[in-house]
C-alpha cells in the first residue's frame, strides 16, 4: 500500500500521516492418508484379487481456498512398488491403479510422475490391485503412497 491523497480538499495533505500493519497468513493445510488394511494372501494360486486402498484427505477449508491434493508412488519413475521389508532388492512394480475422482498426471523433477486433483477436491481414493494371477516370493511387504498439497 502507499500514501493516498485525502478524500476531501478540506483535509490538508500536510496534516496527514500514513501507517500500515503487516499480516502474514501461514499455511496450516495438510493432508492425511488412511493406513490400508493388512492383506494376507498365498504366494501362489490366490483365490481372489486383492487391492491396497488409500484415502487421501484435506480439510474442507483448505479445499475451499483452492488447495489441491497431489500424490505419487515410491517408485523411481512412478510405478507403485511392493517392497520386501527384509530385502529391499525384492520388489514388485504395479503400474495399474484406479482413482476417484480422476486427477491430472503430471511430470515433476527428473521426470517423476505425480497426480494432481482439481481445486476443491477434499478426498482422493487410490486403489492399487495386487493381481490374483501374480506369483510372489513369501515375506512381508509394504506398498507406499506419498501425498502433499499444492496451493496456487
Which residues fall in each region the model found?
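A signal for specific C-terminal beta-sheet/loop modules enriched in small/flexible residues
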Residues: 49-51, 93, 113-117
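Short, solvent-exposed coil/turn linker segments
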Residues: 37-40, 93, 104-105
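Short, surface-exposed beta-strand/strand-loop-strand elements in extracellular ectodomains
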Residues: 82-98
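Generic N-terminal initiation segments characterized by hydrophobic and/or small/turn-forming residues
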Residues: 77-79, 91, 102-103
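Short linear motifs in low-complexity, proline-biased tails and propeptides
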Residues: 95-103, 136-142
Amino acid at each position: 500500500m502507499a500514501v493516498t491523497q485525502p478524500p476531501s480538499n478540506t483535509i490538508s495533505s500536510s496534516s496527514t500521516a500514513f501507517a500500515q500493519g503487516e499480516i502474514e497468513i501461514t499455511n496450516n493445510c495438510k493432508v492425511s492418508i488412511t493406513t490400508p488394511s493388512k492383506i494376507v494372501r498365498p504366494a501362489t494360486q490366490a483365490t481372489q484379487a486383492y487391492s491396497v486402498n488409500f484415502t487421501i484427505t484435506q480439510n474442507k477449508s483448505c479445499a475451499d481456498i483452492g488447495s489441491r491434493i497431489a500424490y505419487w508412488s515410491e517408485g523411481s519413475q512412478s510405478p507403485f512398488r511392493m517392497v520386501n521389508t527384509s530385502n529391499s532388492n525384492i520388489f514388485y512394480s504395479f503400474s495399474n491403479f484406479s482413482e476417484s475422482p480422476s486427477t491430472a498426471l503430471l511430470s515433476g523433477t527428473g521426470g517423476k510422475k505425480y497426480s494432481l486433483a482439481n481445486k476443491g477436491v477434499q478426498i482422493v481414493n487410490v486403489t492399487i490391485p495386487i493381481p490374483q494371477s501374480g506369483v510372489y516370493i513369501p515375506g512381508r511387504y509394504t506398498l507406499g503412497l506419498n501425498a502433499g498439497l499444492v496451493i496456487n
